[in-house]
Regions:
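Active-site hotspot residues in diverse enzymes, especially metal/ion-binding acidic/histidine motifs
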Residues: 1-197
Length: 197
């Protein structure tokens, strides 16, 4: 099994909120006002203390699932047995090419998907979608834009399952339950930004 500890993670990138240790790579943490490097035993999941807040339970669950997924994947593929960070995507931030590659890497995508499977098995997700009358899926405009009423449904569904909005969207995409639509359809019809007709 994995050991879970909470620390004040003090890496240079503030979006690093969790770390699965391989027993070799040091992690910057803040203890007693001092920034130090610590090598945690292999199989230790280090979570940032911010995730202990009550309003962070969905993020905490997804992040634990994400790090657990890295552990499962590493057992199947020893080449991936490296210290792994869970980075939160910040839409307000400008990322370097290197940071983008790290965020969108195959191993991170695998861990996100596996975490969403742990938290939202298909049969549970189907029941929740039926409850919210969207069992055939929901339209998504462009990369990730939802009509306000669909966004509200997604938030209610995420709350019902104890997951974040982002985790639910990842799972729905994986299962092909988001129906892609051109963003211009939303802009012209729903927001009525298409000008006079």
């Amino acid at each position: 099994g994995l050991t879970v500890v909470y620390e004040n993670i003090a890496e240079d990138d503030p979006n690093k909120i969790a770390f699965l240790s391989n027993g070799k790579r040091p992690l910057w943490v803040s203890r007693n006002g001092e920034r130090i490097q610590v090598v945690f035993p292999k199989g230790t999941v280090v979570m940032d203390k911010v995730l202990l807040h009550e309003n962070e339970s969905s993020r905490r669950r997804f992040t634990l699932g994400h790090e657990g997924a890295h552990s499962v994947i590493a057992k199947q593929n020893p080449m991936q047995d490296v210290g792994c960070f869970h980075n939160e995507f910040d839409p307000e931030r400008v990322y370097t090419i290197k940071e983008q590659k790290e965020l969108m890497s195959f191993s991170e995508t695998q861990a996100d998907r596996l975490s969403s499977v742990f938290l939202m098995p298909r049969f549970i997700l189907r029941k929740v979608m039926k409850k919210y009358k969207c069992e055939n899926g929901l339209p998504v405009y462009g990369w990730n834009v939802f009509a306000p009423e669909d966004k509200l449904k997604l938030r209610k569904m995420a709350d019902c399952m104890g997951v974040s909005f982002q985790a639910l969207v990842i799972r729905l995409k994986t299962l092909g339950l988001l129906m892609p639509r051109d963003l211009t359809v939303y802009l012209e019809n729903d927001l009525q930004l298409g000008g006079a007709k």
